[in-house]
C-alpha cells in the first residue's frame, strides 16, 4: 500500500470515528443524536448548492471545503444507516466502486483495443444504467 493510500485510509477512518463519537448515545452531540435521514436532507441540499456556487466561482479552496461538507453528509447518512442495521459506509464505497466498474466496461473489462468516443461512452452508460 502506498503512503498516499495509507494517509487516505487513516483520514477516512478518522472521519468515521468522529461521526461515531458525535452520535454516541452517552457522550455524543445532542443535536447530532436527534438527526435522522429526513432531518439532514435540507443540510445535504444546502451543502450541495454551496459546492455548486464554489465551482461556479472557481474558488478551489472553497470547493475543497464544500467537498468536505458533502463527504460529511455521506458519512452522517452512513452512520445513521449503520445504527439502524441498514448498511455501512463500506457498503456505500463497495457499491459505487462496483457500479463504476460495471458502467465503464471500456476501461475495466477486456477490450479488443478499439478506442471509444465520449458519445459512445455516454450511450453505453445509459444502456447499462437503464
Residue map of PLM features:
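Flexible "arm" and connector segments at domain edges
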Residues: 1-66, 72-130
Amino acid at each position: 500500500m502506498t503512503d498516499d493510500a495509507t494517509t487516505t485510509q487513516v483520514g477516512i477512518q478518522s472521519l468515521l470515528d468522529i461521526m461515531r463519537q458525535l452520535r454516541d448515545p452517552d457522550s455524543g452531540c445532542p443535536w447530532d443524536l436527534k438527526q435522522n435521514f429526513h432531518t439532514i436532507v435540507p443540510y445535504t441540499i444546502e451543502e450541495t448548492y454551496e459546492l455548486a456556487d464554489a465551482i461556479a466561482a472557481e474558488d478551489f479552496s472553497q470547493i475543497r471545503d464544500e467537498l468536505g461538507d458533502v463527504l460529511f453528509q455521506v458519512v452522517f447518512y452512513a452512520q445513521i444507516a449503520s445504527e439502524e442495521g441498514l448498511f455501512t459506509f463500506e457498503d456505500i464505497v463497495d457499491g459505487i466502486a462496483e457500479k463504476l466498474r460495471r458502467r465503464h466496461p471500456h476501461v475495466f473489462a477486456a477490450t479488443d483495443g478499439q478506442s471509444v468516443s465520449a458519445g459512445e461512452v455516454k450511450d453505453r452508460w445509459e444502456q447499462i444504467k437503464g
